């Protein structure tokens, strides 16, 4: 499954995911997270 995080704010945000880390998202940018089948414990 893919989860897409979209920054709809007018400012930069720094979303994070566990496990994995985080990224910088400027306004309008997207971050696609590919979740392996069977993932049961994750947080964004």
Curated annotation (Swiss-Prot):
One of its GO terms (biological process) is killing of cells of another organism. Disulfide bonds: none annotated. Keywords: Antimicrobial, Fungicide, Plant defense. Coiled coil: none annotated. InterPro entries: Osmotin/thaumatin-like_sf, Thaumatin. SUPFAM superfamilies: Osmotin, thaumatin-like protein. It comes from the Eukaryota. Signal peptide: none annotated. Belongs to the thaumatin family. Has antifungal activity. Inhibits the growth of Trichoderma viridae and Candida albicans. This is Antifungal protein R. It comes from Hordeum vulgare (Barley).
